[in-house]
Amino acid sequence: SSAASDVYKRQLLMMKSITLPDRWSMFFKQLIKEIYKLGVDSLWIVIIISVFIGTVIAIQISLNISSPLIPKFTIGYTTREIILLEFSSSIMALILAGKVGSNIASEIGTMRVTEQIDAMEIMGVNSANFLILPKMLGLMIFIPVLVIFSMFTGIMGGIFASYSTSTGMTPSSFEYGLQFYFNEFYIWYSIIKSVVYAFIISSIAAYFGYNVKGGALEVGKASTNAVVMSSIMILLADVILTHLMLT
């Protein structure tokens, strides 16, 4: 019953957050701040991880298909498919759940335990709307940018690996593989998935932060729970969205 009441409380919190802001000027100021803090500040980690993973994927695939029967361009083709379909959206979302989710949960949780949220409620401000909506929208607006950067840098990492001689890849066959049977829907599929993930990360983290009771220790527990819970929900959403959109 606790899980059901959790879901119910989260629905109530979402309904309270997703309303028109009282003061638009304030809302846009917050939105820009959150886009910068949650989105732009995550660019560097997305780029670093994507380059390395793209390189590793290309090297591992080239070692796995060292059979003379398999054409070399499959390395580029498979690297592209893995990065476009799964890595840039789902694996990135898991990494962002750790970075962004814990940030949101601890920030809102700290405001709760220092009684700032109670002060807002007394002043007649819709605290959920004021605190949560800019974070949710900010992440949902900027996550496609992160995904596109991740795809680009991941594939650049693969190209970088194809220039190394020991792997048996040639840049020309790798680049032919990158263009082979390209389906642009996969990029849209990843972007749509990532927006859903952004909603999951921000709403779950906000819920755990908003409902903290206690002190600093509970804030830490809440951000841990937020990361664990949103990771599970991301993987569940991944399965559901893949079934709906690709089969």
Protein language model regions, located:
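Hydrophobic alpha-helical transmembrane segments of multi-pass membrane transport/permease proteins
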Residues: 43-61, 240
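Start (N-cap) of specific transmembrane helices in multi-pass transporter permeases
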Residues: 126-147, 222, 226
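Short cytoplasmic-facing helical segments at TM-TM junctions of multi-pass membrane proteins
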Residues: 108-133, 216-219
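Membrane-interface helix starts
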Residues: 22-48
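Short, small-residue-biased leader/transition segments that mark boundaries at the very start
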Residues: 1-8
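Loop-to-helix entry region at the N-terminal start of transmembrane alpha-helices
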Residues: 41, 45, 49, 70-104, ...
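Hydrophobic alpha-helical transmembrane segments of integral membrane proteins
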Residues: 129-137, 227-247
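Membrane-interfacial helix-loop-helix connectors in multipass membrane proteins
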Residues: 60-84, 152-195, 203-222, 244-247
